[in-house]
């Protein structure tokens, strides 16, 4: 439905879109930062920028009826320029979780800030002991090795290699070692990389 001139948004004059004004108002409604060409909200990296394109389309479809694809592409590029941010700081004193921020001193806040990685799991101080997980570990590892694994998994939640340690799980096939990797994947998501030891053996530049 066509708008009357009185109903036109501030960023449209009847023929052209004022990109600067459009982007300013869009970012007020949808706060974002553009870091190294990728868009972030406080909830983390926007994996599918098509979502942003769809939001732009909703804004402009009331005043434009043709050339929408090109306009959306141009406005998305302009939004990235206006939302530019230098690289986000690496923070080793906190873990960004789905429902807020957990600090290494044991405190927690529901406040969120822009971060490189936000876990998709929520912090719950009253969560019950993971009995099934602990039972699995007791069947897989020696009792004294369980705290070591737990410590290493906790270490992986922080963006640091200060410990200069590597963990190797050695055993026969089919024992359940790979299930630990699945648990790590559910916690870390795309922040975790997997590969085979054969690639590391044959290519010293392979990701470990």
Spell out what each predicted region is.
Residues 29-54, 95-208:
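P-loop NTPase catalytic core of nucleic-acid-dependent motor ATPases
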Residues 1-119:
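Intein modules and their embedded homing endonuclease domains
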């Amino acid at each position: 439905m066509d708008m009357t001139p009185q109903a036109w948004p501030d960023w449209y004059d009847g023929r052209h879109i004022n990109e600067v004004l459009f982007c300013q108002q869009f970012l007020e409604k949808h706060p974002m930062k553009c870091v190294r060409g990728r868009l972030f909200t406080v909830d983390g990296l926007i994996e599918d920028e098509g979502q942003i394109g769809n939001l732009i389309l909703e804004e402009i479809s009331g005043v434009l009826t043709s050339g929408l694809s090109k306009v959306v592409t141009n406005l998305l590029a302009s939004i990235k320029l206006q939302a530019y941010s230098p690289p986000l700081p690496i923070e080793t004193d906190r873990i960004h979780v789905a429902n807020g921020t957990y600090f290494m001193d044991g405190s927690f806040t529901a406040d969120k800030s822009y971060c490189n990685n936000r876990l998709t799991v929520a912090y719950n101080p009253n969560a019950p002991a993971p009995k099934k997980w602990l039972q699995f570990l007791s069947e897989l590892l020696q009792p004294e090795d369980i705290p070591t694994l737990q410590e290493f998994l906790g270490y992986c939640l922080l963006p640091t290699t200060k410990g200069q340690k590597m963990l190797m799980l050695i055993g026969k096939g089919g024992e359940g070692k790979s299930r630990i990797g699945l648990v790590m994947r559910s916690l870390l998501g795309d922040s975790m990389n997997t590969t085979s030891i054969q690639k590391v053996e044959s290519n010293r530049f392979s990701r470990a």
